[in-house]
């Protein structure tokens, strides 16, 4: 087994995981910004709806925060149980 191949696979995986986690964090931050801005717009239009809007905002935010956690789990899978190394070993017959 060529050690340079494994180093290349691990390096590419690390860079890819970093990009994926950054995109998930950015998406989550933008999502929270949009949710909160719409919440404030709703309160400005109908102040008496504040408790109901707050509940909906927190529920939607919780659902939105599930996505980065799923992405984090998948990223940890790629880092610690990299499926590409097994495929590379099988392809070269080692």
UniProtKB/Swiss-Prot annotation:
Pfam families: ATP-synt_C (PF00137)
Primary localization: membrane
Compartments where found: Cell inner membrane
Gene Ontology CC: one annotated term: proton-transporting two-sector ATPase complex, proton-transporting domain
TM spans (from-to): 15-35, 61-81
Keywords on record: ATP synthesis, Cell inner membrane, Cell membrane, CF(0), Hydrogen ion transport, Ion transport, Lipid-binding, Membrane, Transmembrane, Transmembrane helix, Transport
Subunit structure: F-type ATPases have 2 components, F(1) - the catalytic core - and F(0) - the membrane proton channel. F(1) has five subunits: alpha(3), beta(3), gamma(1), delta(1), epsilon(1). F(0) has three main subunits: a(1), b(2) and c(10-14). The alpha and beta chains form an alternating ring which encloses part of the gamma chain. F(1) is attached to F(0) by a central stalk formed by the gamma and epsilon chains, while a peripheral stalk is formed by the delta and b chains.
Function: F(1)F(0) ATP synthase produces ATP from ADP in the presence of a proton or sodium gradient. F-type ATPases consist of two structural domains, F(1) containing the extramembraneous catalytic core and F(0) containing the membrane proton channel, linked together by a central stalk and a peripheral stalk. During catalysis, ATP synthesis in the catalytic domain of F(1) is coupled via a rotary mechanism of the central stalk subunits to proton translocation.
Family label: Belongs to the ATPase C chain family.
Name of this chain's protein: ATP synthase subunit c
Gene source species: Nitrosococcus oceani (strain ATCC 19707 / BCRC 17464 / JCM 30415 / NCIMB 11848 / C-107)
């Amino acid at each position: 087994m060529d050690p340079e191949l494994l180093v290349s696979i691990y390096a590419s995986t690390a860079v890819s995981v970093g990009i994926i986690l950054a995109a998930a964090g950015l998406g989550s931050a933008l999502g929270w910004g949009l949710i909160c801005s719409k919440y404030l717009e709703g309160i400005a239009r109908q102040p008496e709806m504040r408790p109901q809007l707050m509940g909906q905002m927190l529920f939607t935010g919780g659902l939105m925060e599930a996505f980065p956690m799923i992405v984090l789990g998948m990223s940890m899978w790629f880092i610690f149980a990299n499926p590409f190394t097994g495929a590379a070993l099988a392809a070269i017959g080692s």
